[in-house]
Amino acid sequence: MTASPPATLQDPDDAAAFARRHVRHNVLALGADFGLFLIGLSFSSQTTILPAFAAHLGASNLIIGAIPALMTLGWNLPSLFAAGYTESLAHKLPFVLRYTIWERVPFLVLAAVAFFVAGPIPGLALALMLTMLLLMTGAGGLLMPAWMDIVARAVPLGLRGRFFAVSNLLGSGGGLLGSVLTAWVLARMPAPRGFGVCFLLSALCMGLSYVALMRCASRGPRWWRRRRRSEPICAA
């Protein structure tokens, strides 16, 4: 008898079987990523906290009012230009893991700005704040098609509606608690230090969200190490 040849590294049936074996793990990992991301955003709300911080820095009413619109545009517009490139990627997860850092690090920068720059140089702090918001939302918009593709591959169609419903519910519930904690922090800490604590809480949740995304079961190369020639390819 001759042994049957091994499946090719990019065999779609083999990739689908891998996804089915890890569906529970990936649903939990991606759900935690999404939920924690939403909770992190609640500590730096684009409709309350960020405009209030901009007002503290002396921003004009035009800039304060434009912050939510600019962030919404940043989340959505880049996706139109990134979709074609994302579609050409053989593996989406390493791409997302590599560049989603630029969605998360800006919160640490905002915290540093609030603690060390906002007091002595508010004009510079405002410029840095707007730059970080553009970087964060631009990176998020560019990565959105790839992240949605990962969800589509990892979460079966029959579970997808429940996945987003439960993740949104938990994220919104956590966000409500986050809003309460934010109000408590701002009531007890003078500006801009209170804003800095809020940004640190956002960064903490974003970091935990990143760890959850890293736990997504993958057979492909991770961005932080070189792939061995014999290492199988990621389904996502």
Language-model segments: residues:
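Hydrophobic core of transmembrane alpha-helices in multi-pass small-molecule transporters
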Residues: G35, T100, P106-V113, I121-L143
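Juxtamembrane helix-start elements in MFS-like secondary transporters
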Residues: S60-P68, A125, M129, F195
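Transmembrane alpha-helix termini and helix-breaking/packing motifs in multi-pass membrane transporters
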Residues: P51-H56, A83-L89, A111-P120, G175-F199
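A residue-level signal for alpha-helical anchor/packing sites in multi-pass solute transporters
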Residues: A52-F53, I150, A212
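C-terminal membrane-cytosol helix-exit motif in multi-pass small-molecule transporters
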Residues: A203-R222
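Helix-loop boundary and gating motifs at the non-cytosolic
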Residues: T2-T86, L93-A111, A165, G171
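Transmembrane alpha-helix boundary/hinge residues in polytopic small-molecule transporters
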Residues: I49, L80-F81, L142-I150, L181
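Cytoplasmic helix-loop-helix junction between adjacent transmembrane helices
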Residues: M136-L169
